[in-house]
Amino acid sequence: YPKRFEVIEERDAHDYLYEAEKLRTLSGRKYHSKKNHFNGFMKEYGNRFLYRELTQKDFPEAIKLMDRWAEDKEKDQNLVGERLAVEKVFRNYSRLPETKVGGIFIDDVLEAFSFGDLLNPDTAVIHVEKANPEIRGLYAAINKLFLENEFPSVEFVNREEDLGIEGLRQAKLSYKPIKLVEKYTLIEK
């Protein structure tokens, strides 16, 4: 219906789709720098960190981590909306059996967490991932360990959109998506 609708591509809303096994193993030349970050994390913190599934008693610490993470970020509607969405998920966690939340503790302090759920039997969706940016390799570690532990058998991972945030876009592209799931808006003429 090209005469009736205008079609507008929404690049900022495209979802990033990845091969899950590549993110779990970080194997291959494309993932060399990510594997180096992960190995650096393991060398520095290997005997001081613990990955585990988070429970409701951990959620206040996760919110504090989000707040620490956001301290040096420009406040905008995306950050406010994300925090409200995370709080809502945490409040309703007992009614969301498909939702998985995992975190990395270093010296008993929560320094990274991620949460997601299954879109279908083959695809996990990662909604939120936060980590202390001062800790080298922590993002690579939470990405890898969360998938290994919570979604060990999915074939694909959807890490959602970048909202037009340049740093987020670069981070998502650095994990070499196999596809961008395009999104469009239709406007009636």
Q: What are the functions of these language-model segments?
A:
Residues 98-188:
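Aromatic (often tryptophan-rich) hydrophobic motifs at membrane interfaces
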Residues 40, 68, 91-92, 145-149:
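A generic secondary-structure signal
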Residues 1-2, 172:
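Short loop/helix-cap segments at secondary-structure boundaries that form the rim of catalytic
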Residues 58, 188-189:
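Short secondary-structure capping/turn micro-motifs that flank functional sites
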Residues 32, 80-84, 137:
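Conserved phosphate-coordination/catalytic loops
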Residues 56, 62, 66-125:
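A mid-sequence, solvent-exposed acidic-amphipathic segment
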Residues 2-76:
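Acyltransferase donor/substrate-recognition loop-hinge adjacent to the catalytic core
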